[in-house]
Amino acid sequence: MTSKPSTRNDYLPRETHNGEYTGDSPEWQLQINITNKIGGINGDIWLSRDGRSVKWCIEDQCLRQFTYNQKIIKAGYIDFEKTPDCFVVVLSDIAHVYMLKNGGSTTVCFPFQIGNAFWYANGVILERETSASFMDGGYDLKPIEFDLKHKYITLTDPMAPFGLISITNTFKGGINSASGNKTDILQDFQLVLFPSDKDKCIAVFLDRNSKVLRFYYSRILSSDQSRKGELTISSTKKTGLDAAGNSQKSGGISKDLRKFSHLTRRSTSINSNSHDFNAAERVLSGNVGNASGRTDIFALPSSCSRRSLSATLDRMGNNIAPTNRAAPSGFFDSSSANTATHSNITPVSQPMQQQQQEYLNQTATSSKDIVLTEISSLKLPDDIIFTSRRLSSILSKLKFLSLRFERREGLLIFHEPTHFCKIWLIDLLPDVLDSIPFKIYGNSPQNMIRLENLKLKEPSRIQAMYIHELLESCLILVSEGQNKEEYKACLYDPFVKITSPSKNISEELTKQNSLPSLQKLFPYPETSFTKLCFEAVKYITSPAFNISFIFLWQSAYSILLSRANDDVVGGLKMEHDAFSLVLSLLILPIPSSSAQEYQEYKEIYERDLFQHLKQDSEITSSVLPRIVIGLHLIREEYSLNVLCRNEHALLGQFLRFATAAMGWPDLWQSYYVPKMDSESKTFLHPREQNSTFFHPLDEPPSITKSLYSITENSSIPLCPFISFSRLVATDTQVELRITPRSFKILGLYELVHSPNFLPDYVLGILSSFKVDKDELQTYPLGILVPLQNILKILEDKLSEVRDNLELLDRADLQRCSAIINSIRSDSKEVLKRGQRDSYMLCKVPLAKNRSSLSKKPSDIYSILSEIVKSASQVPLDGSAMRMSNIQDDEDIDEGRSLKLNAGLIFSEDKRFTHVVSLLAYYRPTKTQFFTTKTEYAQILAQKKYFAKIMALRTCTNGVGWGAVAYATEKPISTQKWVIQPLNLISVFPDDTKITVKAPEDIAHDIVEWGQFHAGVSSGLRISKKATGITGSWIAFNKPKELDAYHGGFLLGLGLNGHLKNLEEWHIYNYLSPRNTHISIGLLLGMSSSMKGSMDSKLIKVISVHLVAFLPSGSSDLNIDLKLQTAGIIGMGMLYLNSRHKRMSDSIFAQLVSLLNVNDEMVADEEYRLAAGISLGLINLGAGQTKLRKWDSSLLGLGDDLPEDVYDSSDVEQNVMYEDLTTKLLEIVTSTYDVENDWIPENSQIGAVIAIMFLFLKSNNFGISNMLKVDLKEILKANINTRPELLMYREWASNMILWEFIGDDLSFIMKDVDIGVKFSELNTDLLPIYYTMAGRILAMGIRFASTGNLKIRNILLSLVDKFLPLYQYPGKQNLDFRLTISVINVLTNVIVVSLSMVMCASGDLEVLRRVKYLHEVASGPYSDLFQEIPSSKSDVSGVTQVTSNTNTPGNSDRERVDETAASLDDERSSNGSDISDPTAYLEDKKDIDDHYGKFISTNLALGFLFLGSGQYALNTSTLESIAFLSMSVLPTYTTPHPLQELKHFWSMAVEPRCLVIKDISTGDAVNNVPIELVVEEDVEKEEVIREISTPCLLPDFSKIKSIRVKMHGYFPLEVNFTKDYSASDFFSGGTIIYIQRKSESVFENKASFRNVEDIHVALKRKAAESKNYSRLNLKNEQGNTTSSQLVESLGIQDLTMVELDTLLSAGNNTALTDSESYNLGLLCSDKNSGDILDCQLELWYKSFGPHDE
């Protein structure tokens, strides 16, 4: 078993002064060939001499060390195709991959032994060990046989399947030779070199038998091709690693390789630095099938994906490694591709192992990653002998070095014992590489490939050679000197055949690990400034001159470094001085050998390279002037960067000297005007002008002058500027490398000053040029200020999100842009600013610029800055700093913000405060009381009656309080949570207080349910986002005696998802006391938290509480029926939307079976209703999978149903749903002549609910019509059926036809003949009332939270008609009382539906009606309907009926005529005796069903102020609609079943309150006008709504755009598209940040169209400032003219401050032409900036103050 690598940090052996590495661990060797430094990651890889340990080091610091129990084959940095920045260690049977970018790691186990490994551009090439063996049953080692065409396999990603290397052509004697045994040939072929990066293309194979090197051109097949030469040929018969003469395998990769790939692999993902190698093993399969007609490698197009296997395909190792690592047993046959097989890790017997290995021979690879084309070969000398066949032994003597130079690639082949050395070269001609003959056969022109010897001037025996790390085309050659103890080193460029001067080195530098020291002997510039100069020289000159110039610079640099002080160790000036020295010596004539100048630089003058360059007349006449022009253009480039003044000055000094020495016009010297001082003087001076150099221009090109000439008010003609691309006669791409700023700014100015330019275009232009804010700030004043002015204009008017917004000071738009970009990239984590970068293995943050790893932090400030940047991941500019002060968006809808926003939303009056007082169950109830009685005893008795009614209201207040106070608390873990108890005290207007006691005055069951509702409301106050709500916290708040309060609290916590991790012992501690309400709250709460999870443990717990789920013969556990009812709903929640057939059958059985309660079989309707709900939840939306119309013949109802127009995109048919629907419809629609034992009537409502959930929103007309109520038929035929069933059927029918629910009165009153049977109230109208209720309830859910005023007004008109009849005493006959009872239900449904439509709006019109019902006690014992003699009567003597003025919302204008009747007469006629005022108080029964009324009013008040007015009901998902439907079940009559479901709306809410905040302060901004473009729900037309914040947004799916426009703030507009919807945009919180406008620099500024206007205004302003010109400037030290003008004119602009600094009195140096034009750019454009101020300042600088 491969052991876990041990890791430790220690220090690397240190380098001594002579380059030898010593220290505590002398056994470490630098691995040159595996130090790749891909992607900018720096560091070296050191391998121990025993090959079992590897170190990753940066400079002298060891970042990580790994030790293994077997030898390391390969270690280094790799960029996999889709997983960049990896550190990989390859062992014989496993590879360890460490992701440097995210700090994770994984292991890749191989199903075969690995002999060697090679890096390549997209991953690793693995060479299988051909000598691997296994132990048979007789304990004899036998070799493992495998197909050698799979000898080399690619790995492009740790989690990807293997790939194949394929060779295309048939080359004589090559791998694909028709002659010879293919197996023997492949056995002897050894890959010795493969290009490790994308810039190189040549791979080399060694034929060990014939000693022939074969060169192959490689192509990497990937989705992202990095170089030309992609395979595009579509037809060829050549094969991959296969014999051309084998007709049976001429199809390339065999079909076996294209079958299911059962590569077994163990892969373990490890976070951070933890390593877990106990990986779970799994077998996956994938199909990479290849059509029979496409067997060649050229059939794949270049853009297609290389694989069809899943990226998660696993590979599992077998037990063939010498380490005896465990492997899975069993052979995976292709016939079991679809069978998930899980094997234990056990030793593998040899027959099974051999079978598995044979299978891997066929399926080991999935596709081709690399295609090789043989192009050349080389026969090695016979004296080269290989003593071993192992690659390490071969490469220890035979060296291969790969070089690349422009479009040429070379390989240096060096055999150290025999000193054999050859250079193989190829010209990479694109036309040839893309040709079909080359791709197939490797055909190429004769001179394209050549073999050369090393052409050294001094022949010597080469001891070692290396590639210079920074000069990849140059070799470092180490050779013997004249004496054997002397050694020399030099650079050699085989492409231009130039050798650098040799340097003597010590013998230690000829040994291993000496490369770093050797490279220091031949330095290369480290500063970007000098590198840029060298790169410019490379483009201007020939390769020979460039290499020669570099070699001369190295000599000059060494000379200057040797003469410098000890404290000088190089740097920018030293590198530039060496650069200037070489150019100066080339420009100046060679002095006499006796001259001091000659002796000073004799070492350079006498170099052959220098003399060769001086003798070349073309260099003198043409090359050097072009170099000077190029350096001048670089200086102009640096003039556009205020941070590069040092570089600008250094180039100016040299160019002034060079132009003078070359005899160019004086304009060139005067243009530079260097600020000379003793330290900065150049060491060379032109002695005389040299006329041999031509000068291309009379005056130097000036970038600022050219820009100035483009402007509108320029006083000079258009002045062109010579670009670098024109100088070197190439395309403009070179300008982006050498002079990017010049290229960008010239293009920008041309576009900005075009006739059709608008400020709106500037962001797009700057974005196309990739100019960011940091770069813009570094441009000089003349360029920066006009651009800033344009951006300021755009900043003030821009409202929509665009690209490159960081250029503007619009943090609000930047924030919106970040959200939108994260949505588009499916990166939700970017929404949270707290995101932090992962760490590397060494726990060092991986910076964006990975090259920073190579540098040590300079100081503590740098370290802290990197930590801050990594932690915040935001740029430290002004906008980001402002954003960092804002709290996380996850808190915007919670706690304190909710409470504050509630006061803002309902700030116009005290409606919210009043509703809170109505719902606060823990406070005494203020009772509205009015009476016609005069005797104290009667009044007191009536008050007691009112107190009882108010006690019922208090018991239901928790239903509404939980909705109003939803998510307003986030308790801390140490906080003791207190549930306020019910307060059953009623306070009357005369301060009389009456206390209601249980069970004396009110039923104990009602009080317990009141406590339960109070507990639920307390739990709902705790936000879903609250943390620390664990089982321990819940147990900490557990009361000593369990009660209904705590049971409800558990349900409230569960509804918000806080019971997911409740420990088992906590569950049993709660269930053991067998408290009914505790058990109900716990089971339903846990089921809600774990809905849809089908958690097995919770299923067992619930099953114990369901008698029907217990095994037959189980003892009677005496489980309360209400608990069983809650348990069956909990089972449906657990199986939510699972469509579990077995559970569906079990639940359906409960719908039609009798229940054993106390040894009595009962058909409890509440239990069956719960079973129907549970069955619907399990199969929620299952009916949407139907395609065809419903077959009504299944029920024997005939074929007279309308055609089903329902259609769905899901083509699957499930017989289970048809059978289930058939059974449910049979329950609903069947009629029976005799009564059945199981009482099907009690199952009908449950069956209707189940059908509704099955076909919810499916628009299935067939099912809907079966449920729909035919009012005309019912009223005509008087069909005997339960009236309330009509309400449920009509409700379900309309919920199925979701899209067809109307929003007008005609939808409610359809088929209702208003003129018939309305003369009096009787039970004949019950079908109409129940049908209306069902339609209104569907309408309320359909348009929930829409705020539809049309629907509101319709429902208000209806409720106003029925309110006078609510609990109206009237006649006491049964028919009338039943009718009034149905009107009560209808009114309750209307009130709840109204509140759902106007959810969270606090609508006053709705509130008035609900408040009336909530506060007024009506019924037969109320004086509300009593006759009160009026002082004024009409002529006929009819008495007016008035109501108490203390009752708000009570109006008598709409009372029906029946109220004029005498209630006393009615009571007397019915035998009612009211002389005894206490007679009716003895009965505790709620005769008039006040409890049901208060459930509806509390629910309505809760919805009306849901979440303090900041939450909305979500109807976009089936689950949300189902939960909302469960909470508004119209069970308002005794015995009020399923009260616990009244809180399930909490799983159907979403925060939708829009809050506007100031992005600078994070404070809320109120009363912000918002303009919404919303799609109407029914008409589907877009309308504009204007609202003010904080406010409730409509359904996110309906919002098309949102616009914020407030005085003093920047406008903001977000338009939603398919790419990012409003729901996505507000997923992190319904908050929008806006930015306050700063004082515009353009306010009160004049606009000037031409120079004349500016001059007139300038003279006027100069005249106004004449008083300041007389000031004694000598007495005003430090006060310049500019500061006086700024103070007097009120200029508040940093531009003037910078201008003042530039033109300060202490600066006596005259401005150069470039600086003058730069300042001229400030005031030459037509804009609204500070032109006048800048002109005035320049005028004072030029002429000074003058007295009048």
From Swiss-Prot:
- List the pathway annotation: Protein modification; protein ubiquitination
> What phylogenetic lineage does the species belong to?
Eukaryota, Fungi, Dikarya, Ascomycota, Saccharomycotina
Its job: Component of the anaphase promoting complex/cyclosome (APC/C), a cell cycle-regulated E3 ubiquitin-protein ligase complex that controls progression through mitosis and the G1 phase of the cell cycle. The APC/C is thought to confer substrate specificity and, in the presence of ubiquitin-conjugating E2 enzymes, it catalyzes the formation of protein-ubiquitin conjugates that are subsequently degraded by the 26S proteasome.
Keywords tagged on the record? Cell cycle, Cell division, Cytoplasm, Cytoskeleton, Mitosis, Nucleus, Phosphoprotein, Ubl conjugation pathway
Q: Residues annotated as region Disordered?
A: 1-24, 1435-1479
- Basic and acidic residues biased stretches: 1451-1468
Q: Which GO terms describe its cellular component?
A: anaphase-promoting complex; cytoplasm; nucleus; spindle pole
The miscellaneous remark of the record is: Present with 178 molecules/cell in log phase SD medium.
Could you tell me where this protein is found in the cell? Nucleus; Cytoplasm; Cytoplasm, Cytoskeleton, Spindle pole
Q: What is its main location?
A: nucleus
Q: Known InterPro entries for this protein?
A: Apc1 (IPR024990), ARM-like (IPR011989)
Reply yes or no: does the keyword Cytoplasm apply.
Answer: yes
Any one of the GO BP annotations: exit from mitosis
Sites where Phosphoserine occurs are at 1462
Residue ranges with Polar residues bias: 1435-1450
Output this protein's name: Anaphase-promoting complex subunit 1
